[in-house]
């Protein structure tokens, strides 16, 4: 109810900016009980009455992808055809509380332009906690609804564009300063991003272009406490320490003029002659990762990762993928043709033909490994001294939009161990029910005065 009041107050345009930021600080309580996989989403438009009251936005509520689509559909179908997506690297609802003008202290607010835009917008919507999966597919969803490919723009490019109110346009604006945010204070990063938002909106206002804008982030900037600590576990034991959540590293991205290949894994380990090494920290989140040899086109892609020294030599891993059109399904499908490991002039080949899916999707699998206990998706024709295991593996080499994966085609089969267990349990219970019903229907009532073996009893009527 609290968050619904916030959204309603902003939407009608009667609430002032200080009230909005004070309300956002209260909504931050809802995000405190969520996990680290939620980010806020702020929407506003130059048209009126695009969003109905949000009845489900209460403390602790997390907006799913299906609920988000119900909020976005009216704006995309009835609102302006020009959509702006401001995408930050990190953002959490707590940032609005910590760095916004919550109590009227507007001179210290890091969101002055955003605050002004929401205050003047005829329609606006604030969702404090949106599921990370819904945000990761937001660009693809907007592209499908608008029927327009996303266009990565900056301030210089935006001034040269001639936007038309009748033609759909999806403008993706990656806010700057994110690459060097580790060297800057959070307030400076947010202030710089807010200035970019203000300049973009000023450009659209000068051209009198109707628009719908959205501000969100790739991942949260703050790790929220677990719900058990907030709701029911406030009493801590003596000498108890809070376990730190593992950091979520960004995917490896190969770029030429734009991001072309995305690769991610929760754990990336290789073994040479049964000596295992973890390459996760050497691969993800590393600025100087050696991608020499990688290339991409519409039908063929190769991601090349080089490490030196590794096992005393220079080792290169090559993920080779191809995209082909299949008339039967009338769509393009991609497949990873092979995985190569180059070292000391020798090459080890792994067949990974099961890594496949529609080209508009990414591929995800819990384990892609040469170890038989973990699925054995990496197959070699001859015995090899190399072994590899990728945990929570995900890759996309075609139709990449920004640095976010599209919907994932998962490797999980239908008859998984859990499904088999459920089916067998259901069949067993059904057998017991059928047998019991059969026994009940087979019951016959016995007349204790009826003796089928003896003579029939006859009664003579005496008058």
From Swiss-Prot:
<keyword id="KW-1133">Transmembrane helix</keyword>
<dbReference type="GO" id="GO:0033116">
    <property type="term" value="C:endoplasmic reticulum-Golgi intermediate compartment membrane"/>
</dbReference>
<feature type="glycosylation site" description="N-linked (GlcNAc...) asparagine">
    <location>
        <position position="267"/>
    </location>
</feature>
<dbReference type="Pfam" id="PF20520">
    <property type="entry name" value="Ac45-VOA1_TM"/>
</dbReference>
<dbReference type="InterPro" id="IPR046756">
    <property type="entry name" value="VAS1/VOA1_TM"/>
</dbReference>
<keyword id="KW-0406">Ion transport</keyword>
<keyword id="KW-0732">Signal</keyword>
<feature type="topological domain" description="Cytoplasmic">
    <location>
        <begin position="434"/>
        <end position="463"/>
    </location>
</feature>
<dbReference type="GO" id="GO:0099638">
    <property type="term" value="P:endosome to plasma membrane protein transport"/>
</dbReference>
<dbReference type="InterPro" id="IPR046755">
    <property type="entry name" value="VAS1_LD"/>
</dbReference>
<comment type="similarity">
    <text>Belongs to the vacuolar ATPase subunit S1 family.</text>
</comment>
<keyword id="KW-0375">Hydrogen ion transport</keyword>
<comment type="function">
    <text>Accessory subunit of the proton-transporting vacuolar (V)-ATPase protein pump, which is required for luminal acidification of secretory vesicles. Guides the V-type ATPase into specialized subcellular compartments, such as neuroendocrine regulated secretory vesicles or the ruffled border of the osteoclast, thereby regulating its activity. Involved in membrane trafficking and Ca(2+)-dependent membrane fusion. May play a role in the assembly of the V-type ATPase complex.</text>
</comment>
<feature type="topological domain" description="Lumenal">
    <location>
        <begin position="33"/>
        <end position="412"/>
    </location>
</feature>
<dbReference type="GO" id="GO:0005789">
    <property type="term" value="C:endoplasmic reticulum membrane"/>
</dbReference>
<dbReference type="InterPro" id="IPR008388">
    <property type="entry name" value="Ac45_acc_su"/>
</dbReference>
<keyword id="KW-0813">Transport</keyword>
<feature type="propeptide">
    <location>
        <begin position="33"/>
        <end position="225"/>
    </location>
</feature>
<keyword id="KW-0812">Transmembrane</keyword>
<feature type="glycosylation site" description="N-linked (GlcNAc...) asparagine">
    <location>
        <position position="351"/>
    </location>
</feature>
<keyword id="KW-0325">Glycoprotein</keyword>
<feature type="glycosylation site" description="N-linked (GlcNAc...) asparagine">
    <location>
        <position position="297"/>
    </location>
</feature>
<feature type="glycosylation site" description="N-linked (GlcNAc...) asparagine">
    <location>
        <position position="344"/>
    </location>
</feature>
<keyword id="KW-0968">Cytoplasmic vesicle</keyword>
<feature type="glycosylation site" description="N-linked (GlcNAc...) asparagine">
    <location>
        <position position="164"/>
    </location>
</feature>
<keyword id="KW-1015">Disulfide bond</keyword>
<dbReference type="GO" id="GO:0030665">
    <property type="term" value="C:clathrin-coated vesicle membrane"/>
</dbReference>
<dbReference type="GO" id="GO:0006879">
    <property type="term" value="P:intracellular iron ion homeostasis"/>
</dbReference>
<dbReference type="GO" id="GO:0001671">
    <property type="term" value="F:ATPase activator activity"/>
</dbReference>
<comment type="subunit">
    <text>Accessory component of the multisubunit proton-transporting vacuolar (V)-ATPase protein pump. Interacts (via N-terminus) with ATP6AP2 (via N-terminus). Interacts with RNASEK. Interacts with TMEM106B (via C-terminus).</text>
</comment>
<feature type="disulfide bond">
    <location>
        <begin position="365"/>
        <end position="411"/>
    </location>
</feature>
<dbReference type="Pfam" id="PF05827">
    <property type="entry name" value="VAS1_LD"/>
</dbReference>
<dbReference type="GO" id="GO:0010008">
    <property type="term" value="C:endosome membrane"/>
</dbReference>
<dbReference type="GO" id="GO:0036295">
    <property type="term" value="P:cellular response to increased oxygen levels"/>
</dbReference>
<dbReference type="GO" id="GO:0030672">
    <property type="term" value="C:synaptic vesicle membrane"/>
</dbReference>
<keyword id="KW-0770">Synapse</keyword>
<dbReference type="GO" id="GO:0031267">
    <property type="term" value="F:small GTPase binding"/>
</dbReference>
<keyword id="KW-0472">Membrane</keyword>
<protein>
    <recommendedName>
        <fullName>V-type proton ATPase subunit S1</fullName>
    </recommendedName>
</protein>
<feature type="glycosylation site" description="N-linked (GlcNAc...) asparagine">
    <location>
        <position position="399"/>
    </location>
</feature>
<keyword id="KW-0256">Endoplasmic reticulum</keyword>
<feature type="signal peptide">
    <location>
        <begin position="1"/>
        <end position="32"/>
    </location>
</feature>
